[in-house]
């Protein structure tokens, strides 16, 4: 599990995320789209790469991380980057990954959903801020050998429930 200090068992954790810069469009040219590597510990952007479009984020991840030497680092990224080639590239440089599985990997998602999650103990946390209450429940399993994804060691199930809190003294 990742801690607030931005390390997992002493390893640095880097989040990769892409954002389109709002209000930066010039004439007919689309707004710039940037892919950034963020240090979980400090919140600092370590490097960023301009990409031609969102579809180009996948190969841009390698260009982004290459100068950072991902050896020993845990890289987190959204579902767009849940690609076998990306996982192999990170592991091939001695890094580790934590990737989200969604419908862009239908077979992998179906495989993971079929695991015996109801038999797995869970842990939950609750955060309250900005008038919302968010409960996250996490379950973890060792990845079965037959899960077809490079170097997968562990799989997690994260469920999030968000409720809006009523201001005191007001009815909804």
Predicted regions and their residues:
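A short alpha/beta connector and helix-capping loop motif
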Residues: 30-33, 84-102
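Short acidic, glycine/serine/threonine-rich loops at helix termini
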Residues: 25-28, 85-89, 109-113
């Amino acid at each position: 599990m990742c801690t607030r200090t931005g390390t997992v068992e002493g390893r640095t954790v880097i989040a990769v995320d892409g954002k389109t810069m709002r209000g930066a469009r010039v004439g007919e040219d689309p707004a710039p789209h940037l892919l950034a590597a963020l240090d979980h510990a400090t919140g600092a952007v370590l490097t960023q790469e301009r990409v031609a479009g969102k579809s180009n984020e996948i190969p841009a991840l390698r260009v982004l991380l290459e100068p950072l030497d991902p050896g020993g680092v845990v890289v987190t990224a959204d579902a767009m980057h849940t690609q076998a080639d990306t996982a192999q590239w990170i592991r091939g440089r001695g890094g580790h990954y934590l990737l989200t599985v969604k419908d862009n990997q239908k077979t992998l998602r179906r495989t993971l959903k079929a695991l015996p999650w109801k038999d797995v103990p869970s842990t939950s946390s609750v955060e309250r801020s900005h008038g919302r209450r968010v409960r996250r429940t996490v379950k973890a399993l060792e990845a079965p050998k037959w899960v077809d994804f490079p170097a997968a060691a562990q799989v997690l199930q994260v469920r999030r429930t968000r409720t809006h809190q009523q201001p005191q003294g007001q009815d909804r």
